Amino acid sequence: FIESHQLQKLDHELTETSVIQHLMIKDIDVILSVVKSSVKKISANGVPVVNGTPDIMNARIEFDNGCVANLTASRISLNPMHKIRIFQRNSYINVNFEENEAHIFQMASGAEKGKGKMTLKLSEGKEKEVFYIKPELSESNGIREEILSFKESIENNIDND
């Protein structure tokens, strides 16, 4: 399953924009690119706190392949946060967009050796080998890149279907 939290401080200029359009749509794009399955069902709830449109929103997306994504977006948070966590068999991925970092925990199959390997002590004397990976992420500004791409497509008459 996938869990997404996009929490931002109140910005009076953005209260007229839907919290879905402003915050949640980016995470929906990321999740759809990762899951690669058709959407089976969507359930959502929102609460207007500041004005007539929802300021806090929660959506649950169920996919045909059994994956479930739970997304929360808020524009009235005291502590900004933007994280996506992916839980799957034998691995856990945590991407922190605010800090521009990612953490991956992956169960070792036994044959791997190398940096980042840890042993977890479990109950009844059992142990599990786990790899911890912290990939290097490039500094990027997605909105700036989208605007530059849009500008380039106009200037060069490029059709980006």
Language model feature labels by segment:
Residues 1, 156-161:
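Short, intrinsically disordered, charge-balanced linker/junction segments flanking boundaries
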Residues 6-9, 46-49, 109-111:
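Residue-level detector of flexible, active-site-proximal loop/helix-junction positions
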Residues 95, 101-126:
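Mobile, glycine-enriched helix-loop/loop "lid" segments at the mouths of ligand-binding/catalytic clefts
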Residues 8-9, 123-130:
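Short, basic/glycine-rich phosphate-binding loops at helix/coil junctions
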Residues 15-21, 132-141:
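A short glycine-threonine-serine/GTX helix/turn-capping micro-motif
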